[in-house]
A protein has these predicted regions:
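Core SAM-dependent methyltransferase catalytic element
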Residues: 126-150
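Short catalytic micro-motifs in class I SAM-dependent methyltransferases
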Residues: 37-40
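C-terminal alpha-helical "lid/dimerization" subdomain adjacent to the S-adenosyl-L-methionine
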Residues: 69-127, 133
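A short glycine-rich, Lys/Arg-flanked "PGG" loop and its adjoining helix->strand segment in the class I
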Residues: 46-61
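Class I SAM-dependent methyltransferase SAM/SAH-binding core
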Residues: 1-23
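A short acidic, Gly/Pro-enriched loop at the edge of an enzyme's catalytic core
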Residues: 21-33
């Protein structure tokens, strides 16, 4: 993946391979930090959030976007989408996309069964991030969370 990115990007863009739980950057190296669809894919979300806070300067903003399981009225349409429509659409594209379509819904459900929203917000605060807020997007199927590094 990095080789393909290097081929497509300008030379001045520096790509760095690393692990979310142990980033190869100095303390406070970044003024701000964003991530997308990360916490479902790491073994220890708490460790990852502490590491993201470590590499962000004090006062810097940290923000993340994740998929979420909608509440209330939007839950049944979401379930239909991730259980049937997404895998079907994936199958129309390719076998690999069919696998992705079948993986996504269970992955999101299992993550929030292990890490309910309230607990995730606590992890952010425990990592040294203050003024933590979150907002549901896309009829509840997404959630953006942000705060400031203390």
């Amino acid at each position: 993946m990095l080789a393909e990115a290097r081929r497509r990007l300008p030379e001045h863009v520096r790509l760095v391979e690393g692990h979310a739980e142990s980033l190869p950057f100095a303390d406070g190296e970044f003024d701000a930090l964003t991530f997308t669809y990360l916490l479902r894919y790491v073994a220890e979300p708490a460790t990852t959030l502490r590491e993201l806070a470590r590499v962000t300067r004090r006062g810097g903003t940290i923000a993340g976007l994740e998929f979420a399981v909608p509440h209330g009225l939007w839950r049944p349409p979401w379930e239909l989408y991730v259980r049937a429509l997404l895998p079907l659409a994936g199958r129309a594209i390719s076998p690999a996309w069919h696998e992705v379509g079948g993986f996504l819904g269970p992955s999101i459900r299992e993550f929030y069964a292990r890490w309910p929203e309230g607990r995730l917000l606590e992890l952010w605060r425990d990592a040294g991030i203050t003024d933590v807020r979150s907002r549901r997007l896309s009829l509840g199927g997404g959630i953006v969370t942000w705060g400031r590094r203390t």
